[in-house]
Amino acid sequence: MTQVAKKILVTCALPYANGSIHLGHMLEHIQADVWVRYQRMRGHEVNFICADDAHGTPIMLKAQQLGITPEQMIGEMSQEHQTDFAGFNISYDNYHSTHSEENRQLSELIYSRLKENGFIKNRTISQLYDPEKGMFLPDRFVKGTCPKCKSPDQYGDNCEVCGATYSPTELIEPKSVVSGATPVMRDSEHFFFDLPSFSEMLQAWTRSGALQEQVANKMQEWFESGLQQWDISRDAPYFGFEIPNAPGKYFYVWLDAPIGYMGSFKNLCDKRGDSVSFDKYWKKDSTAELYHFIGKDIVYFHSLFWPAMLEGSNFRKPTNLFVHGYVTVNGAKMSKSRGTFIKASTWLNHFDADSLRYYYTAKLSSRIDDIDLNLEDFVQRVNADIVNKVVNLASRNAGFINKRFDGVLASELADPQLYKTFTDAAEVIGEAWESREFGKAIREIMALADLANRYVDEQAPWVVAKQEGRDADLQAICSMGINLFRVLMTYLKPVLPKLTERAEAFLNTELTWDGIQQPLLGHKVNPFKALYNRIDMKQVEALVEASKEEVKATAAPVTGPLADDPIQETITFDDFAKVDLRVALIENAEFVEGSDKLLRLTLDLGGEKRNVFSGIRSAYPDPQALIGRHTIMVANLAPRKMRFGISEGMVMAAGPGGKDIFLLSPDAGAKPGHQVK
């Protein structure tokens, strides 16, 4: 199927520059890379770009904690991110940063055009302010209950449960993430992007049929609830770009983050000395195609704000958004305690990149479904598909070709019809890659692999090799097997770049999509070397354990009271249940003659009196002040004979000791003798 060459620009969502890349990130970058590699195989001109999202208060505060500048932190993080993506063979043409001169200029240009066109509004707003830290709180530094779906523990700008966006002031019971304080309201002038002005355009875009059905349906819900003006400014202190002619005001990170796609491409064009391509891809009437691969948590920003910003500043809109779901591990959310919150670099210390690329690809479709990385299934599938079906097809035939025929393949196909079955599948498999129905493509390829192995099983070259006068048959059978292997690896080339390199070295030819129409006949292959090793659960166990150890190593140091007085070893509930805690009324309190630490307390347990000696004298120099208070005592502690008498229990107190001892008291309404449960 001949295709007209297209110009395509592909992006992935920009990773935030305050943390490492993990397997959740890798789903998107692998999905996009497989699609990009397929497009390149079909002869299209593809520019594949990304960048670090490097602005915002979280980066500013983390840099402060580390004692370095934000610029130093994002520089180090960029190197780490690029190393991880290179390790997974993500074929970016350029990886940049939103903290760049290109991005600053483009952000100011888009803002100025929006302002000139009347889409920027100014007004004074009441904003959440942390009274303890003395700063306005960014959206992500306020948490509370979502005002839409009532889910707790949601950020101040959007809900990760229902996807809604809102103002931090709309949160129910907000708290400052920085200090834990309840924020107060303060006035500040802010700049707003007039999103409602683009409602008609956005609805037409939604109805165009290009967007995934789930995305279009979600957008329709947002239209029905009404679009709101979008706050695009933040107050100092803030790490980002200052808004022109507005001292102390900065672009909100979500304004300049998507512009980072443009900034990265501009940087690529400048590196190439190409002053023309930027406009060819981004001008209003561009015929190039623009695709954003993103997660479902940022659909709102990419489907509403971003196309509206582009429309309002006279740039082209995306051709489409390709949205994916989240990654779970072993059926549950990634967990640091269980060792399933796995960093990309940790994975590469235990497995190759192709294995994860294959597993994710086999599970992906064009729908926005979550993907479960079941580690046991991962091992089984990689061994069954890559090793047993594909690589084994080459290994079981290559030995005979190398040893008996000096690596030269037969001059004719043993089964031309079977070969045609394989090459005819190119259209179905190609369409599956094109439409991002990756799981379907893998199923089609593995069905062909089963056919190929069945052919070899039926022809039994190991038997033919022992029969005199059948050398030509042996060469033809094994050459057929190697040619089928070549077709399979061509179809898998977008998924398995490193295995493809080894396969191409063995086959002594480059694997191209159109090349499979001509089988390798009379062609000399190289000596066969192991192409891929089996994996096992011991590697998985080591991976999980390593992830747990990383969490321990990077855990925040314990501060406060726990640093000096750590929590004791865990006890069972049965152990705890043996302790009988009761409310007691302090009827009398007095000094103990001969002791500078003890007070003698007379306690009423609601019908029973107890005499207790307690080492709280330094904290309560006036024992009479304790009379009439309620406290908590251990009622079933064995009596202890002391020099001053018998102590018949223990009262509960908190604090490190000395003057810092605080007698515990129950809430109002508790009566002497009540059990504490």
Swiss-Prot record:
Record's keyword annotation contains Ubl conjugation: no
CDD domains per record: Anticodon_Ia_Met, MetRS_core, tRNA_bind_EcMetRS_like
PROSITE patterns, per database record: AA_TRNA_LIGASE_I, TRBD
InterPro entries named in the record: aa-tRNA-synth_I_CS, Anticodon_Met, Met-tRNA-synth_bsu_C, Met-tRNA_ligase_1, Met-tRNA_synth, Methionyl/Leucyl_tRNA_Synth, MetRS_core, MetRS_Zn
Intervals of motif 'HIGH' region: 15-25
Residue stretches making up the tRNA-binding domain: 575-677
Enzyme Commission number(s): 6.1.1.10
Keyword terms of this UniProt record: Aminoacyl-tRNA synthetase, ATP-binding, Cytoplasm, Ligase, Metal-binding, Nucleotide-binding, Protein biosynthesis, RNA-binding, tRNA-binding, Zinc
UniProt-annotated binding residues for Zn(2+): C146, C149, C159, C162
Cofactor or coenzyme needed: Zn(2+)
Catalytic activity: tRNA(Met) + L-methionine + ATP = L-methionyl-tRNA(Met) + AMP + diphosphate
Function according to Swiss-Prot or TrEMBL: Is required not only for elongation of protein synthesis but also for the initiation of all mRNA translation through initiator tRNA(fMet) aminoacylation.
Assembly description: Homodimer.
UniProt xrefs under NCBIfam families: metG, metG_C_term, PRK00133.1
Protein's name according to its UniProt entry: Methionine--tRNA ligase
Species annotation: Escherichia coli O6:H1 (strain CFT073 / ATCC 700928 / UPEC)
